[in-house]
Curated annotation (Swiss-Prot):
Lineage, opening ranks: Bacteria, Pseudomonadati, Pseudomonadota, Gammaproteobacteria, Enterobacterales
Keywords recorded for this protein, A-Z: Amino-acid biosynthesis, ATP-binding, Cytoplasm, Kinase, Nucleotide-binding, Threonine biosynthesis, Transferase
Cellular component GO terms, alphabetical: cytoplasm
Keyword match Kinase: yes
Example of a GO biological process term: threonine biosynthetic process
Compartments, as annotated in UniProt: Cytoplasm
UniProt protein name: Homoserine kinase
PANTHER family referenced in this protein's UniProt entry, alphabetically: HOMOSERINE KINASE (PTHR20861:SF1), HOMOSERINE/4-DIPHOSPHOCYTIDYL-2-C-METHYL-D-ERYTHRITOL KINASE (PTHR20861)
Top-level class of the enzyme under EC nomenclature: transferase
Superkingdom assignment: Bacteria
Length: 311
């Protein structure tokens, strides 16, 4: 049996719409991600378990794990009866790269089972293709960091598509999932089709400034450049609590940045000192979570990405 773990991720990181993403892991050692296992069987089957198993479509044709297996069989021209198990631990439509977790874990497991027919570049392209079947458009800001780990920028027009961006070791990422769904399709539909020239200039300056600051180890400049002028002004209305209010409160408590994780409704809060983390986490649990499905996790950068695990 082959078993693969794929971690949750924060797409966009405020400043890099459809371009930046980072893989995350809870600092307490918990697993925030999906597991997929595959083994020989007489007949094909998919079994679902995990904290959010009930959010997975019942019909096989709608299951992204099945779609990954079917597409891989088409590419490899091989069809083998297998048993695939998905342990779904990242909520669907949460802004934490839930579909990417399932896609990455599935394709890494399937590719390994088939003798690694595809290299990493080919796998990544296939992951982006499968992500497009879920969200309605091909993008890599979740699948790339989920697969390869770290903070990454995706350059779709060039051969070396996924590039690692150095982060800061003292950065702590608090993520707060309120327990409600916001689909990627819906969150993309609220975005304008065109942006002003000034918005384009500002976006380019923020993103290039952030990348430059990360490479030159200018932490303050990097923090100052985490500004979302592309998605946040339009997606903030989809959140259950006013984002400006949240940002103001967490910054008063010592956070250095706050924004929407991916398409939302999860938000991220960035801290660069440890002594403010507990207070901010407790406050978010009280004022942002909407039901018992919501959670707050204190995370750090996951540098490994997907991994073949034992058991």
């Amino acid at each position: 049996m082959i078993r693969v773990y794929a971690p949750a991720s924060i797409a966009n990181i405020g400043v890099g719409f459809d371009t930046l993403g980072m893989s995350i892991s809870p600092v307490n050692g918990d697993k925030l991600g999906d597991f997929v296992s595959i083994k020989d069987a007489d007949n094909f089957s998919i079994k679902i378990s995990g904290l959010f198993y009930d959010q997975i479509p019942i019909k096989l044709e709608q299951n992204i794990v099945f779609k990954c297996w079917k597409r891989f069989c088409e590419i490899s021209n091989q069809i083998r009866p297998v048993e695939i198990k998905l342990e779904k631990n990242v909520p669907v439509e949460s802004g934490l790269g839930s579909s990417a977790c399932s896609i990455v874990a599935s394709l890494v497991a399937i590719n390994n089972y088939y003798g690694n027919l595809l290299n990493n570049d080919q796998l990544l392209q296939l992951m982006g293709e499968m992500e497009g079947k879920v969200s309605g458009s091909i993008h890599f800001d979740n699948v790339a960091p989920c697969f390869l780990g770290g903070m990454r920028i995706f350059l779709s027009k060039y051969k070396n598509t996924s590039q690692l961006i150095p982060s800061f070791d003292n950065w702590i990422w608090i993520i707060a999932y309120p327990g409600i769904k916001v689909s990627t399709v819906k969150s993309r539909s609220v975005l304008p089709k065109q942006y002003s020239l000034q918005d384009c200039v500002d976006y380019g300056q923020y993103l290039s400034g952030f990348i430059h600051a990360c490479h030159t180890r200018q932490e303050l400049l990097a923090i100052q450049c985490i500004e979302d002028i592309i998605a946040e002004p339009y997606r903030a209305k989809l959140l259950p609590v006013d984002l400006s209010f949240l940002r103001s409160c967490v910054k008063e408590k010592g956070a250095v940045s706050c924004g929407i994780s991916g398409s939302g409704p999860t938000i991220f809060v960035l801290c660069n000192v440890k002594n403010v983390v507990d207070d901010i986490s407790n406050w978010l649990s009280r004022f942002y979570l909407q039901n018992s499905s919501g959670f707050v996790k204190v995370c750090s950068l996951n540098k490994l990405g997907s991994d073949i695990v034992l058991g």
